[in-house]
Every structure is written in C-alpha cells, then in structure tokens.
Amino acid sequence: MKKNIHILGASGVGTSTLGAALSKRLPHTHLDTDNYYWLDKFTKKREIPERRKLLEKDLTINEKWILSGAVCGWGDNLKSYFDLVVFLWIPQDIRLERLRHREFQRYGNEVLAGGSKYEQSKTFLEWASLYDNAGMEVRSRALHEHWMADLSCPVLKIEDDCSVNERVDRVLDYLSSN
C-alpha cells in the first residue's frame, strides 16, 4: 500500500474532494495545501519558508497521508515524500462552472456585480481559466506536466469528468494492483 499520496490538478477539478473521500476509505490523514498556502484563507499568502516548514512537519508526523492541492513552485523539495501522485483533469467548461458555483456557495450575492467580493471572484475565475493553455509562469497544465515529469514515484492520471466515487474506485484499484 502506498503510504503517501499527492493529488493535484487545476483549481476546481476536485483534488480536495477526492482527498477527503479517499481518507474515509484508507487509513490516511487528509491534508490540503490551502491550509499551508494561505495565512488568511484566499486573501493573504503565507511566506514560502513557513508554508514548507508547516507542511513538512505534518508530512513527517503522520505515518500515512493524502495531500490534496498543488505544491508546484513552492514545495518542490517535497517530491521525495510522495509514493503516488494522482493527477486530475476535467474539461475547462465543467471546471469553471464548478468554480462559479463554489464561489457563489462561499460568498453568495457578494460575488455578483456590485458585491464586495465581485472583483476578487472575477480575478480568481480569470486566473483559473488560464490553466489549460497557459505556460509555466502560472499554475497550469504545462507546469503540472513538467513538474510530474521528473517524479520518482508513479503518476495515476484521471482525465475525465467522473463521480467522486468513480475516482475513489480508480485510485483504490490502482493501489490494490501496484
């Protein structure tokens, strides 16, 4: 059984959801990079050395874990911790619709024109829309593919829009056969 699993992909693809679901089926602690990246959720970033220190501490004190979210660019030193990387991808239109829905669930009417979170949400969604076609300068598929290319662990790619349960089953099937 792989002890340390990292799940990454674009914002809105379901890395946190899959991590949480897998942790209910495996004896693994679920950790999410957002809890290390953000000092104040989605508004103020933590300094990189502090992020690394906090995350590395949790990776070492937990015997088995699932880490959801991306560490590309700030946590490259953690690659050796991973026994399996799961890469998720779904079509952009589905992903952006999920993000719009999540933004509304999180902030309500404040994300609509004239609301206090409108500009922040608009900027976030514009950034998220770059994922499939942007270069290495932002969180993008190109950056993730480049980052995964030199991993020493296996990479399981799930590149279609399927249910959380189907994703869990694919990961569990992979783990049982490898």
From Swiss-Prot:
Pfam families: AAA_18. Gene3D superfamilies: P-loop containing nucleotide triphosphate hydrolases (3.40.50.300). The keyword Signal applies. The keyword Signal applies. Residues 1-19 form the signal peptide. InterPro entries: Cytidylate_Kinase-2, P-loop_NTPase. It comes from the Bacteria. Keywords: Signal. PANTHER family: DNA TOPOLOGY MODULATION PROTEIN FLAR-RELATED PROTEIN (PTHR37816:SF2), YALI0E33011P (PTHR37816). This is Uncharacterized protein YqaC.
